[in-house]
Amino acid sequence: MFSINPLENLKLYISSRPPLVVFMISVSAMAIAFLTLGYFFKIKEIKSPEMAEDWNTFLLRFNDLDLCVSENETLKHLSNDTTTPESTMTVGQARSSTQPPQSLEESGPINISVAITLTLDPLKPFGGYSRNVTHLYSTILGHQIGLSGREAHEEINITFTLPAAWNADDCALHGHCEQAVFTACMTLTAAPGVFPVTVQPPHCIPDTYSNATLWYKIFTTARDANTKYAQDYNPFWCYKGAIGKVYHALNPKLTVVVPDDDRSLINLHLMHTSYFLFVMVITMFCYAVIKGRPSKLRQSNPEFCPEKVALADA
């Protein structure tokens, strides 16, 4: 009568075919990995690999800049009805333009204003200023914030509009030098190719951002991280001045993610692949339980050799 001993057959199969057992374990691990990865794609938003840079990564580049507000710089008085130069175009005008991309690239720089955190840290000794400062401006090149290619040589004009006038008299006269933190309106003026082409952050309006009655603008010198840690670094780079730092907090809405339809398709493919691998492993497992040790090995085993059995009987 035909009988199956599953446990014994499985032991014989494992002992007789170790490479195949290792293969089954590897396929099982791969199936579990695909299943886990598919579930991850289903529940998690994934940053799109097709978009190299979005506004989050672009604004984070400015975190590496040091801005020196020096006492030697002259203040420039501004009137409250100051408008953007005619040679620049706001981002709204650029987006509403019906010109082709080639014409837009040649139309000149555009302005984009975003709210950002700005800290001003007076150094000791600090010279101070004769007026309350409401605006800081600087000019950098693209390579200073890590841009490459043609954009590395593009000029980027930066203007910070403070919500209130910055008064440094307590530091200059009484030595009470405390760090000032502002949520400033940062206006970037540059060629359109410098900016990412993804969803933009909320805009601020520089002309109505400050509540000061008199506006004074001061030039700041920018220093990137490479210059800061270079061997020829000048320790007196911002002597008697204040160091300005920009901080951008990550905004998840600015990150370009893989669309839901694409994520569902990826999840479906991974599920199908993992199911196929599981079926293959289960099939091999069932074969091992039923078949046991291969017939060739069973015949070559001395216990089943008919010649030896006949000699033993003799």
Swiss-Prot record:
The chain crosses the membrane at residues 21-41, 179-199, 236-258, 270-290. It is found in: Membrane. Its main location: membrane. Keywords: Membrane, Transmembrane, Transmembrane helix. Residues 78-106 are annotated as: Disordered. InterPro entries: TMEM248/TMEM219, TMEM248/TMEM219_dom. The keyword Transmembrane applies. One of its GO terms (cellular component) is membrane. Residues 80-105 have a biased composition (Polar residues). Pfam families: TMEM219. Belongs to the TMEM248 family. This is Transmembrane protein 248. It comes from Mus musculus (Mouse). The gene is Tmem248.
